[in-house]
């Protein structure tokens, strides 16, 4: 089940963008926002504040990708590192089967979603390399989310 809402930051000076307009589109994103807001290693963060153009394999057109997060972290050795973060369920981080038993509408949607996500992530990785950043995909494993 997907939850969305407005996040109210406790440290608006850390937020890159308008701190009055922070929206989460899932509880996983909200959990990561709390981490960014409260963790002292996170110097700066933003939610959907970066735009990366990408070529969609589905329609062959240029689209705009808004990654979930931008974060700037002070590492243990004192160096500063910047990341672009995408929060996704683990099941959406691998391709659907190429030869399913039945090619259902759900399967076609999964194939389309996978193709578009793969293109977004490829362009995000290239964009990050050019901008001295690193692209990461966080799943429920990284966010320490357990299912009952």
Feature-to-residue mapping (PLM):
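Electrostatic, structured charged patches in enzyme active sites and in nucleic-acid/phosphate-binding
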Residues: 1-148
């Amino acid at each position: 089940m997907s939850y969305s809402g407005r996040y109210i930051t406790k440290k608006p000076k850390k937020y890159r963008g308008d701190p009055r307009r922070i929206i989460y589109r899932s509880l996983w994103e909200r959990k990561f926002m709390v981490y960014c807001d409260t963790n002292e290693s996170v110097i700066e963060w933003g939610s959907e504040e970066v735009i990366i153009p990408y070529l969609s394999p589905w329609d062959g057109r240029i689209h705009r990708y808004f990654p979930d997060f931008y974060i700037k972290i002070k590492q243990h050795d004192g160096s500063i590192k910047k990341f672009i973060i995408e929060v996704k369920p683990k099941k959406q981080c691998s391709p659907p089967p190429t030869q399913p038993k039945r090619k259902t509408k759900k399967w076609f949607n999964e194939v389309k979603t996978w193709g578009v996500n793969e293109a977004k992530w490829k362009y995000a990785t290239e964009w990050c390399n050019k901008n001295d950043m690193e692209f990461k995909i966080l799943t429920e494993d990284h966010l320490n989310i357990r299912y009952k």
